[in-house]
Regions:
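Conserved beta-strand signature within the Rossmann-like core of class I S-adenosyl-L-methionine
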Residues: 164-171
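A short glycine-rich, Lys/Arg-flanked "PGG" loop and its adjoining helix->strand segment in the class I
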Residues: 149-163
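SAM/dcSAM-binding transferase cores
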Residues: 1-57, 195-295
Length: 295
């Protein structure tokens, strides 16, 4: 391990906005506590984020799962001071950048959590979370249950999302976007917005209309507000900028979990959509981040 990474790990211990739980805080060792979601126990922060981490700021809480270096989390927090944001990732060296920025700029509405996303339900109480962002998550083409919009993950999210809570997916992956659409259809989930080319132009009644203009007049805007539409276009991660510079289209969808499950696995032609995704992996194109990292 390089000296630079060790230095970041050491500095991470000093950031009040970064929670790095030990394994014993979320795993029941008496139940044979290996790293398995079957052996989870509640973390002391569960149900108390606004009180303990955000010093009594009683604001809606939004998660970014697989936040990487945290630039999306911190950017949203700067734009929305009346919302508390928590970026979640397993990579401490990546979280260091976001936590350091939040600390140095004094952002009061940002926190970070270092944990596996499979264990996320150990940290949040029913109704504690208002929205979830999934930004450029690994599409996990070979493992359906590892996809962050799979029925298995929807069941986890349901346990802490407030009624009508929104899940946002922003991705360069056509595979993951089409899979998520199939999941929504199979489970009759309410879709607020969906586009396969976020920065493109669509033809409606013979007129060219940008997706941004379309979203301004959509249900998404009425539910989330026009400021949320602006943020969707104006806040970009490093990877998003890379993908755009190489000509890749950005997909986006927002939906709500409207019922308590069980959630149905969709009919989905994974072979076809893997083939459609193949150009992303040609030499010279931007590689995707490590599985589940989001950055």
């Amino acid at each position: 391990m390089g000296h630079g990474k060790l230095k970041k790990f050491s500095e991470n211990e000093t950031f009040a906005c970064l929670l790095q739980p030990a394994s014993g805080e979320v795993l029941d060792r008496q139940a044979g506590g290996f790293w398995s979601p079957l052996n989870l126990k509640d973390h002391p922060m569960k149900g108390h984020w606004n009180e303990k981490m955000f010093h009594g700021r009683k604001c809606p809480i939004v998660l970014e799962l697989g936040c990487g270096k945290g630039e999306y989390t911190t950017s949203l927090a700067e734009r929305n001071p009346d919302v508390n944001y928590i970026g979640v990732d397993i990579k401490g060296a990546r979280l260091w950048k976001g936590a350091k920025y939040a600390t140095e700029t004094g952002l009061p509405n940002v926190a970070f959590l270092r944990t596996r996303i499979e264990f996320i339900e150990a940290f949040f109480a029913p109704g504690e979370i208002s929205e979830i962002w999934l930004t450029f998550s690994d599409p996990q083409m070979k493992s359906e249950n590892s996809r962050l919009t799979s029925p298995m993950f929807l069941e986890r999210y349901r346990r802490f999302l407030k009624p009508g809570g929104i899940i946002h997916l922003k991705t360069d992956s056509t595979f993951l976007y089409e899979y998520t659409k199939a999941v929504c259809k199979a489970n009759s989930l309410h879709v607020l917005a969906s586009t396969s080319d976020l920065y493109g132009v669509s033809a409606e009644n013979g007129d060219a209309t940008s997706e941004r203009e379309s979203l301004y007049s959509s249900e998404f805007s009425s539910v989330c507000g026009k400021a949320a539409v602006d943020a969707l276009f104006e806040v970009q991660t490093f990877y998003e900028q890379n993908f755009l510079s190489q000509g890749f289209k950005i997909n986006y969808t927002a939906f709500t979990i409207d019922h308590e499950g069980p959630y149905t696995y969709p009919e989905f032609d994974a072979v076809y959509w893997r083939a459609a995704e193949a150009p992303r992996f040609l030499p010279g194109h931007c590689a995707h981040p490590a599985p589940g990292s989001g950055e």
